[in-house]
């Protein structure tokens, strides 16, 4: 690559950081870091109606949590918010007006809506038809004077070359081409309030900030020909474009929607539930890209080293919440206890469970956790009433050898001193029950687990019995024997 690599993530501060936008930021970050380039953040806040208070801070805070850093942003550079660049946009609007490449349009929203309705009723493709079409210069002057006298504030429209062909070699999709006559006619580059439209402002910003590559979602493909028109009108060289495929719900096969309640789609959700940021980074990094091979767990440094824009997928990326949770569990299992305990602490504290055994409980359930908030549900056994058994569990407990096993273990636990009551000493007692009764395997361990914990599966049995405590374990076994 000959020119310096400069890429950007340019969010609108209209709400929380969505997984799709996080992927856009991440892939731009990886592209820049892999090629030794510059990654910048620009805030596109020209849509004042959708502006959310604190939206910018939320975006940056969540990116930082993910482990994404940047070289330039509104925090360190002036005029990196579009709302601070209105004078810059005006300069280029005026230039295009002076060169006859743009013009003021006085058609009202009501007139546009009526024309669109007429076109749809006639089976025509909706498009703007130049309001000055067929007017002489005198008629045009009179029309403008009449509109201005009526207090109508004009927009500014780019004069589209309808015979033009607008094409680019997309980094992801390959050759893409649009005809100038198929984009809906002359389009607005400056709104009535003086703010630029997205497709105009983004070109000015990208050019002046020397952006070399624009990598974004393929919902922007239809914007690209309009942006190429602005580059052409201003005589500027366009950057390279790459449009990543949509993210779809793996269960429905449809575009990821906020209505998909079975998925966590905002980075804030993962923070709130106590996921490890490294796991979320890893998962997002594989949504529409992979380095080849079977490996799925990569560090940030490995992602940077391996990232290759030529391996961005042409097929939609499937968002699978179960896969995310599996990956998160892998990270939690392999993390040190202190890290996970600190992650779980707020949830234990809120539930009133930050006892002297809290760290040991986290250690016990760490292999089962996908997020730190799960520690509360996992430890219900130690703080709540004994759960109601399922039909399958009741069937196990109806076995003819169950009373023999439970009575034998109860005697062993009663005989243990407080000093002896440690995980390392509890397992030999279970083995002694096996030796004395001749009962082994599932017929031995399953009744004990269900009697003690009320569940068929869980962490290591000796640790569960130890953390439950000798008296409570005996009480649970006793209650189970009475219910048989």
Swiss-Prot record:
It comes from the Bacteria. PANTHER family: GLUTAMATE--TRNA LIGASE, GLUTAMATE--TRNA LIGASE, MITOCHONDRIAL-RELATED. This is Glutamate--tRNA ligase. It holds the Pfam family tRNA-synt_1c. PROSITE patterns: AA_TRNA_LIGASE_I (PS00178). Keywords: Aminoacyl-tRNA synthetase, ATP-binding, Cytoplasm, Ligase, Nucleotide-binding, Protein biosynthesis. The keyword Amino-acid biosynthesis does not apply. It catalyses: tRNA(Glu) + L-glutamate + ATP = L-glutamyl-tRNA(Glu) + AMP + diphosphate. Its main location: cytoplasm. Monomer. A motif ('KMSKS' region) lies at residues 255-259. Its EC number is 6.1.1.17. GO terms for cellular component: cytosol. A motif ('HIGH' region) lies at residues 11-21. Catalyzes the attachment of glutamate to tRNA(Glu) in a two-step reaction: glutamate is first activated by ATP to form Glu-AMP and then transferred to the acceptor end of tRNA(Glu). ATP binds at residue 258. Coiled coil: none annotated. The keyword Phosphoprotein does not apply. It is found in: Cytoplasm. GO terms for molecular function: ATP binding; glutamate-tRNA ligase activity; tRNA binding; zinc ion binding. InterPro entries: aa-tRNA-synth_I_cd-bd (IPR045462), aa-tRNA-synth_I_codon-bd_sub2 (IPR020751), aa-tRNA-synth_I_CS (IPR001412), aa_tRNA-synth_I_cd-bd_sf (IPR008925), Glu-tRNA-ligase_bac/mito (IPR004527), Glu/Gln-tRNA-synth (IPR000924), Glu/Gln-tRNA-synth_Ib_cat-dom (IPR020058), GluQ/Sye (IPR049940). One of its GO terms (biological process) is glutamyl-tRNA aminoacylation. It is an enzyme of class 6 (ligase).
């Amino acid at each position: 690559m000959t020119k310096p690599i400069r890429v950007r993530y340019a969010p609108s501060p209209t709400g929380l950081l969505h997984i799709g936008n996080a992927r856009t930021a991440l892939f731009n970050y990886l592209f820049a870091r892999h090629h030794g380039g510059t990654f910048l953040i620009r805030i596109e806040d020209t849509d004042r109606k959708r502006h959310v208070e604190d939206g910018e801070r939320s975006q940056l805070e969540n990116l930082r949590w993910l482990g994404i850093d940047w070289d330039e942003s509104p925090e360190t550079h002036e005029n990196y918010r579009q709302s601070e660049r209105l004078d810059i946009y005006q300069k280029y609007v005026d230039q295009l007006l002076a060169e006859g490449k743009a013009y003021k349009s006085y058609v009202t929203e009501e007139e546009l809506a009526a024309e669109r309705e007429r076109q749809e009723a006639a089976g025509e493709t909706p498009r703007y038809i130049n309001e000055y079409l067929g007017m002489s210069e005198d008629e045009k002057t009179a029309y403008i004077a009449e509109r201005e006298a009526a207090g109508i504030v004009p927009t500014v429209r780019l004069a589209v070359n309808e015979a033009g062909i607008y094409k680019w070699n997309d980094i992801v999709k390959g050759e893409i081409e649009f005809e100038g006559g198929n984009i809906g006619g002359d389009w607005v580059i400056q709104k009535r309030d003086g703010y630029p439209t997205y497709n105009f402002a983004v070109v000015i910003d990208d050019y002046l900030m020397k952006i070399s590559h624009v990598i974004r979602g393929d919902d922007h493909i239809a914007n690209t020909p309009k942006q190429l028109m602005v580059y052409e009108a201003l005589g500027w060289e366009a950057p390279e474009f790459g449009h990543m495929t949509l993210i779809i719900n793996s269960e429905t096969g449809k575009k990821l929607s906020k209505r998909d309640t079975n998925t966590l789609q905002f980075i804030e959700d993962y923070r709130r539930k106590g996921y490890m940021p490294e796991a979320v980074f890893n998962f997002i990094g594989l949504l529409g890209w992979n380095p080849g091979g079977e490996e799925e767990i990569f560090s940030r440094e490995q992602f940077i080293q391996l990232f290759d824009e030529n391996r961005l997928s042409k097929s939609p990326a499937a968002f699978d919440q179960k896969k995310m949770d599996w990956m998160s569990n892998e990270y939690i299992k392999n993390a040190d206890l202190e890290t996970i305990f600190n992650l779980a602490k707020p949830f234990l504290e809120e539930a009133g469970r930050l006892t002297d055994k809290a760290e040991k409980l986290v250690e016990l359930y760490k292999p089962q956790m996908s997020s730190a908030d799960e520690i509360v549900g996992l430890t219900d056994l130690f703080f709540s009433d004994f759960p109601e058994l399922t039909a399958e569990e009741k069937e196990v407990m109806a076995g003819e050898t169950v009373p023999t096993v439970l009575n034998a273990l109860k005697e062993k636990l009663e005989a243990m001193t407080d000093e002896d009551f440690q995980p390392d000493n509890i397992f030999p007692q279970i083995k002694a029950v096996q030796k004395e009764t001749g009962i082994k395997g599932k017929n031995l361990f399953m009744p004990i687990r269900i009697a003690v914990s009320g569940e068929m599966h869980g962490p290591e049995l000796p640790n569960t019995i130890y953390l439950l405590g000798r008296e409570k374990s005996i009480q649970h076994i006793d209650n189970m024997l009475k219910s048989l």
